[in-house]
Amino acid sequence: MLRLCLPTRAGYVRNFSNDKPRKPETHYEVLNIRNDCSTREVRNAFVQLSKLYHPDVKSNAACPERTARFVQISEAYKTLIKPERRRDYDDSLLWQPSRSDRSPVGETVNPGQAWDVRPNYDPNPGPYYGIRGLKRVSNWQVAVVLMALGFVGALFGFTSVRSSFKLSRQIQDEISAEANSHHAAVVADAQKYGNEEQVRRMVDRMSRSPFNQSSAK
């Protein structure tokens, strides 16, 4: 029996190790800024790049590549200039594929490494979003500050209620003292001049009352 052995056709085996697709740029890379840059830095970067790639510039009018680049710059600016859209975009950067879904021929791929998890934070973070002088604080520091504010608020409320109660009681004591003084004066006049004199004075005051005078007319 004859046994045919076909040679390996190595010429038809292509190695795609050098044909990896180019990784798309992030908005930060398009504007050439840091991930923790401030809103002002985003605006300044957009202004500078617009001067270079804006379609109204004569040198860019006949260059489709520069026009397409300006579209990328505008999209990056619209996303990063608004805090809410920027936070959503930063969250989307947490998960990114490290390579194409297609496994190149001749390249060993570990299924467990199909995706590269890249946390979107710096191990040594600087100021939050580039705000100068504002440092990041830990959760326990925030909790301590909130507890201190709560204690100060409770103390202020207790002091306010206590002061209000003391003031109200002081006013009541003054009114009571004035009433007692008037009552004592009336009793003293009654003892000094007698009841008949008190009645005559009361009738005299009533006769001088404007209400009684208008009624008499």
UniProtKB/Swiss-Prot annotation:
One Pfam family name is: DnaJ
For molecular function, the Gene Ontology terms on record are: unfolded protein binding
Where is it made, tissue-wise? Highly expressed in testis and ejaculatory bulb.
Which SUPFAM superfamilies does the entry link to?
A: Chaperone J-domain (SSF46565)
Q: How does it sit in the membrane?
A: Single-pass membrane protein
Record's InterPro entries? DnaJ_C4, DnaJ_domain, J_dom_sf
Q: Which residues form the J domain?
A: 26-93
* Disordered, as annotated region: 95-119
Chaperone: is it a keyword of this entry?
Answer: yes
Give the record's GO biological process terms: cell differentiation; protein refolding; response to heat; spermatogenesis
Its main localization is: membrane
Q: Which PROSITE patterns match?
A: DNAJ_2
> For this UniProt entry, what's an example GO CC term?
membrane
Keywords assigned by UniProt, alphabetized? Chaperone, Developmental protein, Differentiation, Membrane, Spermatogenesis, Transmembrane, Transmembrane helix
Function comment: May play an important function during spermatogenesis and/or in the male genital tract.
Q: Per its record, how is this protein called by name?
A: DnaJ-like protein 60
Organism, as annotated: Drosophila melanogaster (Fruit fly)
Which taxonomic lineage is given here?
A: Eukaryota, Metazoa, Ecdysozoa, Arthropoda, Hexapoda
* Primary gene name: DnaJ-60
